[in-house]
Amino acid sequence: MIKYLIVGLGNIGPEYHETRHNIGFMTVEALARINNAPPFIDGRYGFTTSFSIKGRQLILLKPSTFMNLSGLAVRYWMQKENIPLENVLIVVDDLALPFGTLRLKGKGSDAGHNGLKHIAAILGTQNYARLRFGIGNDFPKGGQIDYVLGHFTDEDRKTMDERLETAGEIIKSFCLAGIDITMNQFNKK
């Protein structure tokens, strides 16, 4: 069975639950729920669960290292499960995209995101797939930290379930059809 590591970035703790910065956690939680995966288990460097589709095992990870040390969890679980870099997908919040916009990329810069920055530093490369989930940037100058650690608006919540489902479709397509086909299919939406 071919293994994939799907990492939703976020911060642990009730104060961060369902904040914009935790959209990665929310995405893998929704993917697990929709696919009837068992509950997440507290393991080394994170909480994991898995499910299989068409000969592929998707291992879902919510790092418990806090955002800025996410690379430790990614490296550990890649090594533990013997997963090659091309089978790793990081789900991350993105301030530069309007809320709900989803963009799959095969590589790229960290765009100022400390979780991605640490992953690149630990893995020694920026050449890993990431699914950027737009959280918008409707905040006053100097208000970025409060914004990303804030909760979604009622307006955002209206489309949240649909956007999380679409993110799950993108993740499954990444595992089944590959990144190029998936980017062509979904990045236009």
UniProtKB/Swiss-Prot annotation:
One of its GO terms (biological process) is protein quality control for misfolded or incompletely synthesized proteins. It catalyses: an N-acyl-L-alpha-aminoacyl-tRNA + H2O = an N-acyl-L-amino acid + a tRNA + H(+). InterPro entries: Pept_tRNA_hydro, Pept_tRNA_hydro_CS, Pept_tRNA_hydro_sf. It is found in: Cytoplasm. GO terms for molecular function: peptidyl-tRNA hydrolase activity; tRNA binding. Keywords: Cytoplasm, Hydrolase, RNA-binding, tRNA-binding. Its EC number is 3.1.1.29. TRNA binds at residues 16, 66, 68, 114. GO terms for cellular component: cytoplasm. The record marks 11 as: Discriminates between blocked and unblocked aminoacyl-tRNA. The record marks 93 as: Stabilizes the basic form of H active site to accept a proton. Belongs to the PTH family. Hydrolyzes ribosome-free peptidyl-tRNAs (with 1 or more amino acids incorporated), which drop off the ribosome during protein synthesis, or as a result of ribosome stalling. Catalyzes the release of premature peptidyl moieties from peptidyl-tRNA molecules trapped in stalled 50S ribosomal subunits, and thus maintains levels of free tRNAs and 50S ribosomes. Monomer. This is Peptidyl-tRNA hydrolase. The lineage of its organism: Bacteria, Pseudomonadati, Bacteroidota, Bacteroidia, Bacteroidales. The gene is pth.
